[in-house]
Amino acid sequence: MRIKICGITRVEDVLFAEKAGADAIGVVMYSPTSRRSVPDAKAREIFSALGPFVTRVVVTHTESESDLEKILAIRPDAIQISHPFVFEKYPGVRVLRVIGRGDAVPTDCDAVIVDESMGAGKAFDQEFAKVVAKTSRVPVILAGGLTPENVGLAIREIRPHAVDVASGVETEPGIKDHTKIAAFIRAAREADHGT
């Protein structure tokens, strides 16, 4: 089970998330409607603060080649995009595609993220998530409405490869609550290990 803490906007939050056991960190870039979107310099600062064993993910809604070049310049391990945006694969950069109910499960990616709300923190469709988890040929990441209180049940019911949280561990958009991060990671690990 892997755990991604997404929508990081502050170095102190990324340092805490890494120490608490997060496997991946997400920063939002070139997404002007998101209150979690950060400029290039801030994304670089956040990623630079991480040790070598945490996966760095850029979440974006851009379709601009120029923006993508700037994103690639900060050297993310993966880029998370909404399906069906056509995205050329770049060597060494994994592609995570976000899908919702009714979307076909894409195969032109390294993993799919089941998120009905496309990052708005609304609960995922459990039946759709179960079908995707059982039929996908790539790893499935569960997102949308997850909190420290419900992540354990979601993991036990759906058995995703990973879980992804943003608003479920925040005090306000982009400001993480360290107590909630620790509780989320603990609950996810306990559910994964059957405790």
Swiss-Prot record:
<dbReference type="InterPro" id="IPR044643">
    <property type="entry name" value="TrpF_fam"/>
</dbReference>
<dbReference type="GO" id="GO:0000162">
    <property type="term" value="P:L-tryptophan biosynthetic process"/>
</dbReference>
<keyword id="KW-0413">Isomerase</keyword>
<dbReference type="InterPro" id="IPR001240">
    <property type="entry name" value="PRAI_dom"/>
</dbReference>
<comment type="similarity">
    <text>Belongs to the TrpF family.</text>
</comment>
<comment type="pathway">
    <text>Amino-acid biosynthesis; L-tryptophan biosynthesis; L-tryptophan from chorismate: step 3/5.</text>
</comment>
<keyword id="KW-0028">Amino-acid biosynthesis</keyword>
<dbReference type="GO" id="GO:0004640">
    <property type="term" value="F:phosphoribosylanthranilate isomerase activity"/>
</dbReference>
<dbReference type="InterPro" id="IPR013785">
    <property type="entry name" value="Aldolase_TIM"/>
</dbReference>
<keyword id="KW-0822">Tryptophan biosynthesis</keyword>
<protein>
    <recommendedName>
        <fullName>N-(5'-phosphoribosyl)anthranilate isomerase</fullName>
        <ecNumber>5.3.1.24</ecNumber>
    </recommendedName>
</protein>
<dbReference type="Pfam" id="PF00697">
    <property type="entry name" value="PRAI"/>
</dbReference>
<dbReference type="InterPro" id="IPR011060">
    <property type="entry name" value="RibuloseP-bd_barrel"/>
</dbReference>
<keyword id="KW-0057">Aromatic amino acid biosynthesis</keyword>
